[in-house]
């Protein structure tokens, strides 16, 4: 699921949008420096 053009809330609940434009969970998507939007606080 791509998300870069649909920020700020592009992904399903519980997922983050990575700087590479994909939704996912974990540090690769949600971590500092990796997350573009809809990041976990």
Curated annotation (Swiss-Prot):
Record carries keyword Disulfide bond: yes
Domain Chitin-binding type-1: 4-41
Keyword Phosphoprotein: no
InterPro entries with a match to the protein in the record: Chitin-bd_1 (IPR001002), Chitin-binding_1_CS (IPR018371), Endochitinase-like_sf (IPR036861)
UniProt keyword annotations, A-Z: Antimicrobial, Chitin-binding, Disulfide bond, Fungicide, Plant defense, Pyrrolidone carboxylic acid
Pyrrolidone carboxylic acid PTM sites in chain numbering: 1
GO-annotated molecular function: chitin binding
Disulfide pairings: 3-17, 7-37, 11-23, 16-30, 35-39
GO term, biological process aspect, one: killing of cells of another organism
Subunit and interaction comment: Monomer.
Functional note: Has antifungal activity against P.infestans, A.lycopersici, V.dahliae, G.zeae, A.nicotianae, F.moniliforme, F.oxysporum and C.gossypii.
Name of this protein: Antifungal peptide 1
């Amino acid at each position: 699921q791509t998300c870069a053009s649909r920020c700020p809330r592009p992904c399903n609940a519980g997922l983050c949008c990575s700087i590479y434009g994909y939704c996912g969970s974990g540090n690769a998507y949600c971590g500092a420096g990796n997350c573009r939007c809809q990041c976990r606080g």
